[in-house]
Amino acid sequence: MSFIQVTKEEFNTHAQQVSERSFMQTEEMAKLLEKRGFSISYVAWKEGNQIEVSAIVYSMPMTGGLRMEVNCGPIHSSVAHLSDFYQCLKDYAKANGALELVIKPYDTYQIFDSNGEPISSEQKQLISQLTDLGYSFDGLQTGYPGGEPDWHYVKELSGIEEKDLIKSFSKKGKPLVKKAKTFGIKLKKLKRDELSIFKEITSATSDRREYSDKSLDYYQDFYDAFGDNADFMVATLNFQDYFDHLESNQAKLRARIVKLQADLETNPKSEKKQNQLRELSSQFETFDVRKGEATAFIDKYGQEDIVLAGSLFVYTPQ
């Protein structure tokens, strides 16, 4: 049993054996970090010839020494010697001149439902396992400490086919998707020379959410490092297309209203149809309001596709 440095190939072999892994612990991320000026090393705990725990460790000079970090790691196929790994990692950091060693484990401390209510107990041993070895705990944080969130929203997709995806959404989510489909929103995958569009979105978001944004060249380096394993996506809206969608859907609504009015001429006392007519008439008026808004945007933007939102999708085997 031993704590050792391993090759990139050995790390990748072990990484394929674990059930959970963040993109932060991938060969692509190591390539990106090296491009950004970090020193990279692959370390592991071995039992015999078998790696049980491994991690990408990256370092950056600070006054008087190095700052060393394991982000979203280590990864492990067995937790039996996880404490041994953490202890040896301290020794490794000290031997290599690190003044600060930061570990951000990729373990779930507690699970909450969509309403913010806990549905699992706190896994306090995840913290004590490190503090018992002399590590300091920064506390459970909110927001974007260090430019990244500690809270992750995870949707379980196992067993869900594409045709059933919307059915799995919440009561609030289903009508929002239905409404969005009437807008004529289009998705676009950005090319490398279009990443300034993505940067404009992240800059605006970071100002609004009060966290530090990455630079444009960081996103370009990310694009280069991850290749087909990452997509920079944006949602766009052409307001003329949006107006045309509104016109089409309002016309369908008008046909339903005309039919209801004809039915009420035959059966004017039908309370059910009267209620339906009131509801559809209200929806019809809403379309008029939305068309007025769309017209104002057409006057401003013409036929231009306007970017509404963007997101970076990163793919890992796990």
Model features per residue range: what roles?
Residues 64-145, 304-309, 318:
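Acyl-donor binding region in acyl/amide transferases
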Residues 3-64, 135-146, 156-318:
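A conserved beta-strand-loop-helix scaffold within acyl/acetyltransferase catalytic domains
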